[in-house]
Amino acid sequence: RVEQKLFVERKQRVVFGARWDQEKQPQFFMDLAQAYKQKHPETEFAICSGGPLRSNNEYYVDEAKHLANEGIITINENLQKNDYYNILADSRVLFNCALQDWTSNTVSEADALGCNVLFPAYRSFPEVFSNDHTRMYVPWSQQDAMSKLEILLSKPSPSMGQISDWTDSTIDRMIDIMTGKGEQWRRDGPHYR
């Protein structure tokens, strides 16, 4: 069982829960952590890994270890699932900077555990977040990510807990579109842009 804390009692922590591989953009997370901690040194930036921290590009592992030695980030390795859930339940933001994802498990897990989520407004994420601009940042914009992060570290999103409901409906909308009964859900025309 995972015990959730009230949002105001949670650590000022930003979690990276994705694989530490190049397509997940770990460099953006590390750059963000360095820049944000200059202004807010009390904020913890934590990497969570189910095994030893590894990557398809060893540079990212080396750089993460260097930043951990500098006190910029924390590396949590060899976590069991409940250990990870306990970290999420005591954190304020799950941060993602992936170039691609569909419905990320990390999104649903964090949202269910009362942890805000912040993802790039890219590929499938706008649909996952129902175009909630408060939980998405302009891709590759450190400035936008930092300003959204500051807000999400201070208070829970009013949309907290709605991601799973929206995702369930996404499958129904996709089937409606494929069977010709979902024109109102299409997002490929000028009315959507």
Identify what each model region corresponds to.
Residues 3-24, 30-33, 46:
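Conserved donor-binding/catalytic core segment of Leloir-type glycosyltransferases
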Residues 58-79:
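Nucleotide-activated donor-binding/catalytic signature segment of Leloir-type glycosyltransferases, i.e.
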Residues 85, 107-112, 126-127:
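Short alpha-helical segment that forms part of, or immediately flanks, the ligand-binding pocket
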Residues 86-91:
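Short alpha-helical donor nucleotide-sugar binding micro-motif in glycosyltransferases
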Residues 116-119:
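Short hydrophobic beta-strand element within catalytic cores of glycosyltransferases
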Residues 154-193:
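A charged, aromatic-enriched C-terminal amphipathic alpha-helix characteristic of glycosyltransferases
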